[in-house]
């Protein structure tokens, strides 16, 4: 009888495996098919494209709406004064330059950012200036300083924003929380925002690969009646693949919320909790790290990024699928109150106040280094360094 049951299980397993293999092959073909069959016609059609995102129709803009020749003509009389050369300044500045637009950098002379800009080919007196000189020369002033630095430098920058210029942000932080930052944009200028959904390094690397990062855009002031098209065009010019409309308020709330949640803080907390429980139950550091971080980042997350979470439920084993289906509602119900508190904390300005207070302290770098050193010395991340060394490509 046991042999008969075992034979049935094996047979059923083979049938399920065969069906799942066929389903995955069909699914994979479905995911890859649009790239070959539908993208090109969409690129060659109208500028406005409406996409149904899970039942909500939104208008998106793509590179096809602003090809390079159109960008060069639209911005032919403009100079982009990019203030700050940190993560976003680096990525957006180099992409603008590679797209053939007239961009200059404004930073503190002889400071670290000045030296970094020179290493990237920016030339003092030609396209590298002090902040004041750059703003005076620019028709677009792209304020890409850190949030704390924007607040500190605003009294010096605001008088330089003369009529006719366009003020640009990549984060809604400063103008939205103006009661805390004291950054109140002039009412007689177009004020726009383009917020890449990733770091400046990613903005640059995806552009160099011929791809593009997703970005949102928003308009604070539309004095000329052209603020929307300015933002859409500039979003493409800095290297966006597609861009969608939001507001300054929604951008800053979703950005702060995401960074503290699934993008950084929340995922780090989940990694630590799972790792700790495994270690407390006798699992080795290597096993705990592999089951918590390595498998997630090297195997599962790339597939989720490429095909979606629904694909993963088809792609995993029957045992993994059953467990995930049973447990994801439990995690959702446990975590949702935390996320609700987090969103309220971003919306009411608590996170902004905390950020400004900490990042404006004269010894904030020393305090930050202590916090980062604590993370570096956590067992989980020490183990991670050793595990990464064992990857074949690192040997």
Swiss-Prot record:
NADP(+) binds at residues 84-93, 108-113, 146-150. Belongs to the ketol-acid reductoisomerase family. Its cofactor is Mg(2+). This is Ketol-acid reductoisomerase, mitochondrial. The active site is at 171. Mg(2+) 1 binds at residues 255, 259. The gene is ILV5. Residues 363-395 are annotated as: Hydrophilic. Keywords: Amino-acid biosynthesis, Branched-chain amino acid biosynthesis, Magnesium, Metal-binding, Mitochondrion, NADP, Oxidoreductase, Phosphoprotein, Transit peptide. It comes from Saccharomyces cerevisiae (strain ATCC 204508 / S288c). It is an enzyme of class 1 (oxidoreductase). It catalyses: (2R)-2,3-dihydroxy-3-methylbutanoate + NADP(+) = (2S)-2-acetolactate + NADPH + H(+); (2R,3R)-2,3-dihydroxy-3-methylpentanoate + NADP(+) = (S)-2-ethyl-2-hydroxy-3-oxobutanoate + NADPH + H(+). Residues 57-246 form the KARI N-terminal Rossmann domain. Binds 2 magnesium ions per subunit. GO terms for molecular function: double-stranded DNA binding; ketol-acid reductoisomerase activity; metal ion binding. Involved in the biosynthesis of branched-chain amino acids (BCAA). Catalyzes the second common step in the parallel biosynthesis of isoleucine and valine. Converts alpha-aceto-alpha-hydroxybutyrate (AHB) to alpha,beta-dihydroxy-beta-methylvalerate (DHMV) and alpha-acetolactate (AL) to alpha,beta-dihydroxy-isovalerate (DHV) in isoleucine and valine biosynthesis, respectively. The modification Phosphoserine is found at residue 355. Pathway: Amino-acid biosynthesis; L-isoleucine biosynthesis; L-isoleucine from 2-oxobutanoate: step 2/4; Amino-acid biosynthesis; L-valine biosynthesis; L-valine from pyruvate: step 2/4. Residues 1-47 form a transit peptide. Its main location: mitochondrion. It is found in: Mitochondrion. Residues 247-394 form the KARI C-terminal knotted domain. Pfam families: KARI_C, KARI_N. Present with 883000 molecules/cell in log phase SD medium. Substrate binds at residue 317. One of its GO terms (cellular component) is mitochondrion. The lineage of its organism: Eukaryota, Fungi, Dikarya, Ascomycota, Saccharomycotina.
């Amino acid at each position: 009888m046991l042999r008969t049951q075992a034979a049935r299980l094996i047979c059923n397993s083979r049938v399920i495996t065969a069906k799942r293999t066929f389903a995955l092959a069909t699914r994979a073909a479905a995911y890859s098919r649009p790239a070959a069959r539908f993208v090109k016609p969409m690129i060659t059609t109208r500028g406005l494209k409406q996409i149904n995102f899970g039942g909500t129709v939104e208008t998106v803009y793509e590179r096809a709406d602003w090809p390079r020749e159109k960008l060069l003509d639209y911005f032919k009389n403009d100079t982009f004064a990019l203030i700050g050369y940190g993560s976003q300044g680096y990525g957006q500045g180099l992409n603008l330059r590679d797209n053939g637009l007239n961009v200059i950098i404004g930073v503190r002379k002889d400071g670290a950012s000045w030296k970094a800009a020179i290493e990237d080919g920016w030339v003092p007196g030609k396209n590298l200036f002090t902040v004041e000189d750059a703003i005076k020369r620019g028709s677009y002033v792209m304020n890409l300083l850190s949030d704390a630095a924007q607040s500190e430098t605003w009294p010096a920058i605001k008088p330089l924003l003369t009529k006719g210029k366009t003020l640009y942000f990549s984060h809604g932080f400063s103008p939205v929380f103006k009661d805390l930052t004291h950054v109140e944009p002039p009412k007689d200028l177009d004020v726009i925002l383009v917020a890449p959904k990733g770091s400046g390094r990613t903005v640059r690397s995806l552009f160099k690969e011929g791809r593009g990062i997703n970005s949102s855009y928003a308009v604070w002031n539309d004095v000329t009646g052209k603020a929307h098209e300015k933002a859409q065009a500039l979003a493409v010019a800095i290297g966006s693949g597609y861009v969608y409309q939001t507001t300054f308020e929604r951008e800053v709330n979703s950005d702060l919320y995401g960074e503290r949640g699934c993008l950084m803080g929340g995922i780090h907390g989940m990694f630590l909790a799972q790792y700790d429980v495994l270690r407390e139950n006798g699992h080795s550091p290597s096993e705990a790290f592999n089951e918590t971080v390595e498998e997630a980042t090297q195997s599962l997350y790339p597939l989720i990024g490429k095909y979606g979470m629904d694909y993963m439920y088809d792609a995993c084993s029957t045992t993994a699928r059953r467990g995930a289906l049973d447990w994801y509602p439990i995690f959702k119900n446990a975590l949702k109150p935390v996320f609700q508190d987090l969103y309220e904390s971003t919306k009411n300005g608590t996170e902004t106040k905390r950020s400004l207070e900490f990042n404006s302290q004269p010894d904030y770098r020393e305090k930050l280094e202590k916090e980062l050193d604590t993370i570096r010395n956590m067992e989980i991340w020490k183990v991670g360094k050793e595990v990464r060394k064992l990857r074949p490509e690192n040997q």
